[in-house]
A protein has these predicted regions:
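Glycine-rich, flexible beta-strand/loop modules in the N-terminal catalytic cores of phosphate-handling
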Residues: 21, 28-106, 195-217
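A short glycine/serine-rich beta->alpha loop
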Residues: 78-82, 115-124
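Short, conserved micro-motifs enriched in small and acidic residues
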Residues: 83-88, 122-130
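Buried hydrophobic packing segments
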Residues: 40, 93, 97, 128-140
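Short, Gly/Pro- and small/polar-rich lid/capping loops
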Residues: 1-32
Length: 236
């Protein structure tokens, strides 16, 4: 069955990365993937979590939130603390960002990534990972210059959703596809093709190894295109 937006199974949605969207942050990126829009900022802060103190090493962590009207109906703000889904997503973003570093030898500083969804049409967590990597790259340059340490940023990290809809493996699901997918997965990749994380769920039963392999092939091809866009945004 054709996709609603006319894309082929292996096509990404239109992708745009606006580096430096927030001039106050040490690093920032406004990422648009189709109808999904996420603002990612990276802030360098003095100090580290308590368990990290005295080690001389830094840390990278992430927070994620959705604006109330990022979705078709208003969602209340999480004023009582992050819910389970939010915790899961921000931990994913943090793990992915740390995979971009060569290590944490940049003194007791924390780089905090804030990923705020302005508009959601599927793939918000994967868009956040890809945008956060651009913001992190710039923040690491700023930190290295101010702290007199080697730039800890080593490689780009990108993420994309894949799934099976109407029996067909597809790349970069929009919300309309995501909500009816037989299989829904998110894949995080460190450049060029190192798997950082694979999250996959059979929503209505099981799926075959061959289908998983096809989804991974789609994800690796998709993240290769995202890496190219990240490099272009960073001027590399």
């Amino acid at each position: 069955m054709p996709r609603a937006d006319g894309r082929a199974a292996g096509d990404l949605r239109p992708l745009a990365l606006e580096r430096g969207a927030n001039p106050y942050a040490e690093g920032s990126c406004l990422v648009r993937m189709g109808g999904t829009l996420v603002l990612c900022t990276a802030s360098v802060e003095a100090g580290v979590p308590g368990w990290r103190k005295g080690t001389g090493q830094g840390w990278v962590t992430a927070e994620y939130a959705m604006l109330p009207r990022a979705t078709t109906e208003r969602t209340p703000r999480e004023r009582q603390g992050a819910g389970g889904r939010t915790h899961e997503i921000q931990r994913l973003i943090g793990r992915s960002a740390r995979a971009a570093l060569r290590g944490f030898d940049f003194g007791e500083h924390t780089i905090r990534l804030d990923c705020d969804v302005l508009q959601a049409d599927g793939g918000t967590r994967t868009a956040a990972v890809s945008g956060a990597a651009v913001a992190l790259a710039d923040a690491c340059v700023r930190l290295a210059g101010s702290a007199g340490v080697k730039n800890p940023f080593e490689r780009l990290v990108a993420a994309v959703s894949v799934g099976i809809v109407d029996g067909e493996p597809r790349l970069d699901l929009c919300y309309a596809e995501d909500k009816v997918a037989e299989v829904d997965a998110n894949v995080v990749v460190a450049e060029p093709d190192g798997l950082v994380e694979v999250q996959g769920t059979g929503e209505h039963g099981t799926f075959a190894r061959a289908q998983l392999d096809r989804m991974l092939d789609l994800a690796l091809a998709g993240t290769a295109r995202i890496f190219a866009a990240q490099r272009s945004a960073l001027g590399w």
